[in-house]
Amino acid sequence: AQRTAAPAATEAAAEESTEAAAPAVSADGKIAMITDSGDITDESFNQITWETCVAYGDKNGIEYQYYKPAEDTDEERINAIDLAVADGASVIVMPGYLFGPAIAEEQDLYPDVSFIAVDVTEADIVDLSGNAVGISDNVYICSFQEEQAGYLAGYAIAKDGKTKLGFLGGMAVPAVIRYGYGFVQGAD
């Protein structure tokens, strides 16, 4: 995994926060964001996840850093998690279903670290052999209903009078497939 320096939250940014509620993350720790196989400038999941970590860190005076696995493998995602924890991360944010096996392997090794998995479902949390693994209390997953956005897009284009339609997704991954199904149903 590759450490990538990120600017630390400034004192000025911490002073600007006027909210009375305490941040969900202790200022003693650090937020780590690990990219899947992309980069934080991909204009997609990695970038928006990184920008959100930066905004949260700046607002709450919490350090942040991102890590990019050396290769697109479960082992390298695990190595990136280990590196982030060694660097003091108390929260690790991971965008994408590819993190399922890494979470399954690491969640119990670091019970004091909060893992936030974006666009990951319980079905994605499998060990390196593909066996389903339960989610520990320190893991928070959120997934999207891409088919709803796809449905609305399909409906809108059909309502606009377009009848000769097609759908081309970037890759045949679960999120894109769900979006495509929704698009076709909305256009129908």
Segment roles from a protein language model:
Residues 1-188:
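A residue-level marker of the well-folded mature domains of exported/periplasmic proteins
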